[in-house]
Amino acid sequence: MQNQLTIKEIALELGISREEFDLIEEKLGRIPNEFETYLFSAQWSEHCGYKHSKHYLKKINESYESENAGYVQIGGKAVVFKVESHNHPSAVEPYQGAATGIGGIVRDILAMGARPIALLDSLKFGNVFDPKVKNIFEGVVSGISDYGNSIGVPTVGGETSFNEIYSTNPLINVMCVGVANKNHLASSHADGPDKLLVYVGSKTGRDGIHGASFASKKLSGKDDRPSVQVGDPFTEKNLIEATLEILKIKGVRACQDMGAAGVLSSTSEMAYKGGVGCELYLDNIPKRQEDIEPWEIMLSESQERMLFLVNPGTEKKVEAICNKYLIDFAVIGKTISTPHYVVKENSEGKVLADLPIDILVNAPEYYRNNTIPSTYILNKAKKYPKTKIKDIDKILKILLSNHNISSKKWIYQQYDYKVETNTIFIPEQADSAVLWLKKTQKAIAVTIDSNELYTYLDPFEGTKNVVYEAARNLISVGAKPLAITDNLNFGDPDDPEVSWQFEKSIEGLIEASKELSTPVVSGNVSFYNSYHETSIFPTPVIGMIGEIKDIKKIVNLKFKDCGDVVYLIGKTDINVDKIGGSFYLKVLEGFVGGEIDFVNPMYERYLQNFILDLIDKGILKSVHDVSKGGLLTALAVSCILSNRGFKGILDASIEELFGENQGRFIVSVRSKDSRIFEDIAKSSNINVKKLGEIKSSDDGIDICSAYFDLKELKSIYFDSISKSVEE
């Protein structure tokens, strides 16, 4: 009895609930031993088991997590992509948390047999004037920069937001894109018994132990640094090349990154997906410390490690490649026909665990009775405040200086965004990053987007807006949207209000993806983004990829020549009753509430096809989606980044200038093409409004009886973040 109580106490300490421990005992028909209890603590964690999200994720895609990443076919190639988070580790150890987040997502792409070609990130922080937040911000950017630059994968784009709700819970979401031969994609599924499990990469140490469990609970403020992994980008670079070579060997059957829960998760899931069991020999696993405990070996999340399944006789070829790249190699076990997960000290030694593999990998599925948050009702009922500042000059300058809208140059200038020479535009020059597919005329466009104000005020419509915003960003460079990857960042799933937000966000994602014919092919869920009793705003992050058929026809947001005519396309008349969630209200009025604007799916798709057609015809010289900060902010950014002035003919209210209604683009055309453009728009039933014409930089921006000196605006826009960091 004493032993049983001890095991149960260990289980509770490891995060297994009483009900879950009883369920394990019931399924096994016995009490697990201590070692097995450690295995369950990781595999049944939220991070590995998706306990609170599986019910909803099945509605998106039945094979949502079948492989390491999703892909689309473009130009005869498989373009592989996925986004993941490293939120908790980055809150505790910003530099290593962010760096190893890069390493992990790169290995997910690598495990598909794809060469990583680009990184993007979605970063959320609190107020950077807070010293603690500033430390996290600088550490995260440095970690991303050092790791990404060292492995030779460019960071080509992303977004960074600042909101006090993320002060103790920063969000570090990273997207990676890779390219592979469409006929040679690797699988993570074992394909039968009597195959060898081969370990490749760094040695196993104590870093990252309990990382999966750590990511499955609220941040407490305690020292959780032992749960944070430590990265080595130079080993990762060698691992990338070694993996791509190993996957060319005929006898290599499957590949899996050793991520969350390390050896345990990679081996058990590979075997389970293939309908077989496996047998592991711990003495064979390369170790940094000889005194490392068996359970530590299994749960360690030491970085830069991969698992391969190979035919017997193939291992020598794999070993030769590992020797070439100076990384560790070991045969650590084999697949077996019996569907059990067996762990031994060595091939002849003591059995430490013997578990039915389906019980180990299939955590329970929870479906809560959700509750509509009281804030949801209250926020919708809020009346917009009377405008305190009516001076357009002051409003625009305040918005351009706000860290959510100002240039992120301080961040991206630390990234090597041109390495491998695939990148067409430097960051911020276009609404999406564009990557050339070498030896073809095609390119891919990639973007990553979110809007926590929208998704807080209305998780369903807000998530739809984010998906459509991502699509607009691709349209703005001439790319047809193809597919989605997502990272769903939420608070405590045991809170019925958070669970409601999650469900509604999923429903919005599903509806928008169907409307745009952009399937969700991969993704991730990050729960427990809460500190004590405060959860973050619901923050679904959407990565989207699109195809550009002719790289010669791409456009960006920069105005080109003086005399070109500028138009607003789409919703030309703003609904002043639906400007809730706008940065104008948040920044100028300190107000978060009211109704957000909804997308019109049919019109939006028609509008997007219209823009793509005009880009293809060469009529549009620049395209810029109107989003954060509204119309005048978007117009000013195009002027700033192109070093061009603007003479406007617009007479508009503050709400029209700074509201954020959906489905709008700013475009420019040659003066000689303006009549043709207007005629095509009229015949296509597309709303357009002439805004003015492009002038020289010396002319500044003249609009709505206000004049802006371009040099002053450039200084405000480019220097805001750097001044805050350096203070």
UniProtKB/Swiss-Prot annotation:
CDD domains according to UniProt: PurL_repeat1, PurL_repeat2
Top-level EC class: ligase
InterPro entries, A to Z: PRibForGlyAmidine_synth_PurL, PurL_linker, PurM-like_C_dom, PurM-like_C_sf, PurM-like_N, PurM-like_N_sf
Catalysed reaction, written as an equation: N(2)-formyl-N(1)-(5-phospho-beta-D-ribosyl)glycinamide + L-glutamine + ATP + H2O = 2-formamido-N(1)-(5-O-phospho-beta-D-ribosyl)acetamidine + L-glutamate + ADP + phosphate + H(+)
GO molecular-function terms, A-Z: ATP binding; magnesium ion binding; phosphoribosylformylglycinamidine synthase activity
Chief location: cytoplasm
EC number of this enzyme: 6.3.5.3
PANTHER family tied to this protein: PHOSPHORIBOSYLFORMYLGLYCINAMIDINE SYNTHASE SUBUNIT PURL
Cited NCBIfam families: FGAM_synth_II, PRK01213.1
Protein name per the record: Phosphoribosylformylglycinamidine synthase subunit PurL
Organism: Petrotoga mobilis (strain DSM 10674 / SJ95)
